[in-house]
Amino acid sequence: MNAHPKTAALTDTIYAKPPSSETAHRLVAAANSLLQHFETGKPIDAKTLRTTMEDAFSASDTNGAWVWKDAYDAVEIAQIMMIARYGALMRKQAASPAQFLSMVERLSALAPSHTRRSEDSVRLQQFSTPLPLAAIVAEAAGFRATDLVLEPSAGTGMLAVFGQIAGAVIALNELAEVRRGVLRSLFANALVSGHDAASIDDRLIRAITPSVIVMNPPFSAAQHVDGKFRKATSQHVLSALARLAPAGRLVVITGESFAPKTKSHESTFRSIGEVADVVFSAAIAGKVFARHGTSIDTRLTVIDKRSAGEDVALTDA
């Protein structure tokens, strides 16, 4: 469908950005339309995405009603809907975790690349977790139906949805108001909060003591701080670890330098070592995020919190 006739009819009007709740509603509506493409295995190109967004917002991006970051969020929401609807069946049909990952990769390949970035996404480092990497995080987390899963920097819930299909109870925290609205729509039974995840342990209600935390926090950005804030990752991880239940597991995606032997993070890992053990850490090439608007090298780290009274594990430095 050619969008020009509709766009021409709208160019005389400059549209104000819809209220957050309305934007969330329209993003979910766009995602529902895009879901049909994923269900039938059809790739989503820029033309299809633009038309879908114009239909959902009754306006073009040139009028200011939506930006391309919104469009990419709609695609991501549709992917989450796919996993919520079909993920459990996909897992059942897969003969191995590798085969399940292959299914997820084929689904991910249908989505367009993030070729345009908004000022907010850059400032707040809102670079979404690629769907295949989210599946790997889920495998590392080992979700069970008995778990209470917290995603402190939830975005649209790309990590948490894998806990949901495992039958776990879900708690989601997201600072951005529009994304919180999306989360409430996608995860009807989840507790959704809007705190600064850098101090999640101080802010979240005490009744939530997660057995698993999965997170992809900003690498070097913080609320109310201009420019880079190099302690951002440490603050997010340490606060999440403080909230994690004894014997719980934390799986985190960070910048590549977040490692025990990096001088700037030595004190953070000493603090981690007082209550938990790093059981896995591996660097991830930046090309994994390339389709999502950034090529920064990252790291996947798995941290197991010790049970109350458990001795510190002795490991080689």
PLM segments and residue spans:
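A conditional alpha-helix N-cap/helix-loop micro-motif detector
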Residues: 130, 194, 230-234
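Conserved beta-strand segments of alpha/beta enzyme cores
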Residues: 169, 189-193, 277-280
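Conserved proline-anchored active-site loop of SAM-dependent methyltransferases
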Residues: 134-165, 172-173, 194-227, 239-259, ...
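Short, structured coil segments at secondary-structure junctions
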Residues: 166, 186-188, 274
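C-terminal lobe and adjacent flexible extensions of AdoMet/dcAdoMet transferase-like proteins
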Residues: 303-307, 317
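Class I S-adenosyl-L-methionine
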Residues: 11-184
